[in-house]
Amino acid sequence: MTITPQQLIALLPLLIVGLTVVVVMLSIAWRRNHFLNATLSVLGLNAALVSLWFVGQAGAMDVTPLMRVDGFAMLYTGLVLLASLATCTFAYPWLEGYYDNKEEFYLLVLIASLGGILLANANHLAALFLGIELISLPLFGLIGYAYRQKRSLEASIKYTILSAAASSFLLFGIALLYAQSGNLSFVALGKSLGDNMLHEPLLLAGLGMMIVGLGFKLSLVPFHLWTPDVYQGAPAPVSTFLATASKIAIFSVVMRLFLYAPVGDSEAVRVVLGVIAFASIIFGNLMALSQTNIKRLLGYSSISHLGYLMVALIALQNGSMSMEAVGVYLAGYLFSSLGAFGVVSLMSSPYRGPDADSLFSYRGLFWHRPILSAVMTVMMLSLAGIPMTLGFIGKFYVLAVGVQAGLWWLTAAVVIGSAIGLYYYLRVAVSLYLSAPQQLNRDAPTNWQYSAGGIVVLISALLVLIFGIYPQPLITLVQHAMPLM
């Protein structure tokens, strides 16, 4: 098989990140230098982001039977790269106080983002499985990076067990689908499923297994078991990557699979997905109510956000508005999560014990770090879906899609979930403005806004507000990513 220059251009983000992985590996082997390797990683990710412009000029194409590069792939590749960039940026000050080898952290983030890009472009079940493994395996190491802390090591082991269970279910489901249809390509699967094969027991069993596997990866109820423990134990920059890049990449490939293969046409599958979405929204929000640890709280809130997205996924057969809703919602979720976890990262460092994840650490933050408190408040309001923030636009889209598709009980769940969510997000926001404790046990650096991590947090807050007030540029961008399917 010969690859044309056009196809090489279409693969540029993947090739650039792959090349960066090799360069960083060689750089570590040659000489350990934290600043040099962090810079190389950030430059590589930035170059991959810039290359998306050239990919757009090349147009939509099937590069290999495993991958399709189009507007959809470009949008989600861009979001994954932004999340990876933010992770590296937050990790630099966090790793400055780390006693052991710092450089491998960037290497693992780059390999995981490579998996994310592969997932965004995947057009075949083999690429889906490869991408999921490529994004999961580096995370085992990243979650346990602060291995001197018991919680970090525990989180790593729990995530490894969860991942192994998910992969085995997923692989078995893929095998059953292949046994029945003889195809692994999304398009060919779509044709097989279109020929009234959706009632075949083997096919339904395969789909069920895949839903279980992907449910583990997306931390949907009832497959969310140790998700909050993993968020709590992982270093703050890794929690950022877990909440954003890994979720966005996996959700994008699930959406492409549902677009090509009309899985939602089966009433049984729709009911199962509906129950999972309903349970994720209600359970995620109810469990977050009692949390006093901000990383656990954000872990439970990520379960409910994925539940909201599932509503749009179930309504996918009802037109392109669902795809638009998912694109806008994920962009809002990305920037809100980057800001929230960014603040936690700025307040944390490995040599001061566990991360600053207790709500008490943020009490009265406004009185000595007013701008940082304002940023955190904006992020909490956006995650809660308050008007004038990007989170509201995403929630509004999901509600509109639910109403349009006639998913009344799921739309009611979104409304109830948002009402419950309002309480615990505002609890975090209000604690920032209470009187500060006598002795500050945690604080961000004095000049935090001049650090790279601080700039990322401020830009995220600005984008959440700007797109919340005037969302048209973002909506146009998401719409442009759709017709190239």
UniProtKB/Swiss-Prot annotation:
Gene Ontology terms, MF aspect: NADH dehydrogenase (ubiquinone) activity; NADH:ubiquinone reductase (non-electrogenic) activity; quinone binding
Catalytic reaction list: a quinone + NADH + 5 H(+)(in) = a quinol + NAD(+) + 4 H(+)(out)
Its EC number(s): 7.1.1.-
Protein's membrane topology: Multi-pass membrane protein
Localization: Cell inner membrane
Gene Ontology CC terms, in alphabetical order: plasma membrane
Subunit structure of this chain's protein: NDH-1 is composed of 13 different subunits. Subunits NuoA, H, J, K, L, M, N constitute the membrane sector of the complex.
Its job: NDH-1 shuttles electrons from NADH, via FMN and iron-sulfur (Fe-S) centers, to quinones in the respiratory chain. The immediate electron acceptor for the enzyme in this species is believed to be ubiquinone. Couples the redox reaction to proton translocation (for every two electrons transferred, four hydrogen ions are translocated across the cytoplasmic membrane), and thus conserves the redox energy in a proton gradient.
Protein name: NADH-quinone oxidoreductase subunit N
Organism the protein comes from: Enterobacter sp. (strain 638)
